[in-house]
Structure formats: C-alpha cells, structure tokens
Amino acid sequence: MATVSMRDMLQAGVHFGHQTRYWNPKMKPFIFGARNKVHIINLEKTVPMFNEALAELSKISSRKGKILFVGTKRAASEAVKEHALSCDQFFVNHRWLGGMLTNWKTVRQSIKRLKDLEIQSQDGTFDKLTKKEALMRTRELSKLENSLGGIKDMGGLPDALFVVDADHEHIAIKEANNLGIPVFSIVDTNSDPDGVDFIIPGNDDAIRAVSLYLTAVAATVREGRSQDLAQQAEETFAEAE
C-alpha cells in the first residue's frame, strides 16, 4: 500500500492552511499554530490520518469497490480526472449537479442520453441532420460529457468518495452522508470536518499538495485492485486443480 511521509508532505506544502481570520474552529484539533497570520496544520496528525485513509481505500478497492473522485475547483480539476482514470475509477471534476447521488435514477437517464449521442456522433447520424440540429446535438453531447463523462460507466452508486476540498464540495458530501457512502476528504483550516468519515487535514489549494494526495490514493487503489485480481486467479487455479 502507498504511504506518505512527513517529509513528502512538508515538501508539497500540505501544512499551510488558510489565513487565521477564515478558520473554522472545528479544525482546532488539527492546527499546530499560526505563522504570519496563516494557520499551520499539524502534520503529526495528518500523516497517520492520511495513511489510515489509504489503508481503508485499499480494502474497498480490493473488494471491487467503486471510488468516486470529486474535485471541481480549478486547482484540482485536471489532476482529479487524470488520477481517477489512472486507477480505472470515476470522477466529477467540473460542476457537481445537485442529486448526482441522491437522484441517481434521473442521472442514469442523462447518462443513457449521453451514450446515445456518442453513438450518433460516430455512426454518421449527425451528418444526416441539418447544420443547426447537428450543432445543437454536438453542444448537448459536450455539455453532458463535461458533467457526466467521469461517471458514465460507473453503473450505480459508488462505494466511497474521495474529495479534494470539503468546503467546496459540501453538497457532494451531504448526498453521500444521506446514502451512507463513506467520505474521505482533504479538509483545510477553513472547512467544516462534519460529515467526513476519514478526515485528512491539509492544504487543499496548492497544486503540489493536491497532486501528492491524488498520486497516493490512485496508487493505493491500483494496488488494492491487483490484490483482488491475484485472489481471483488463485481461486480459479484452485478450482482447476
């Protein structure tokens, strides 16, 4: 299982929180102090909490669990997509649509529409339409791909959420809470940790910090999935004997 050290976190700037005036008092247990009116996160808390989260994510992925990566703000968007794809998982990296989890039935219909449009764009259907109609469908396809492309093959609700910014993604967290889906989240000093099952106190703005979290999570998920595949191979071999 991938692990992250104190040194890795220091180099990535994980310990830098927000300005002290923007703090959420619920994050007090995870704050070491302040420097130049900026809160410093206690990495002695973060390191074991992150590694505990990784261990749990490894268990989920080794049971074929589906993990949804959520990070819709600019600093995280591309990295969220890249790392989710690198471990064959799912992502939302633009806008979180209200009801994405709690109204899955409707979302599933939109995903079906997205897949239908993808087929039409490839089988020549668009070429037979008027320019105006083809343009409208192309725009619809682009819009649906933007919002649902990362979950179109999820095939049902996820088994866990990995969230980059608890404050920014509070709607996603609330929906997961309502459905009993465990939430793993980076929680900065300005955020509310309530509703997060596995809190990872840390900087959620610095690109290097965000990349550090995502790299470790993706590696852990890949490893967990390979354990599952190895176990399947062993069982198949045993049956053959």
Swiss-Prot record:
The lineage of its organism: Bacteria, Pseudomonadati, Pseudomonadota, Gammaproteobacteria, Enterobacterales. GO terms for molecular function: structural constituent of ribosome. Keywords: Ribonucleoprotein, Ribosomal protein. PANTHER family: 30S RIBOSOMAL PROTEIN S2 PROKARYOTIC AND ORGANELLAR (PTHR12534), SMALL RIBOSOMAL SUBUNIT PROTEIN US2M (PTHR12534:SF0). It comes from Erwinia tasmaniensis (strain DSM 17950 / CFBP 7177 / CIP 109463 / NCPPB 4357 / Et1/99). This is Small ribosomal subunit protein uS2. InterPro entries: Ribosomal_uS2, Ribosomal_uS2_bac/mit/plastid, Ribosomal_uS2_CS, Ribosomal_uS2_flav_dom_sf. Pfam families: Ribosomal_S2. Belongs to the universal ribosomal protein uS2 family. Transmembrane segments: none annotated. One of its GO terms (cellular component) is cytosolic small ribosomal subunit. One of its GO terms (biological process) is translation.
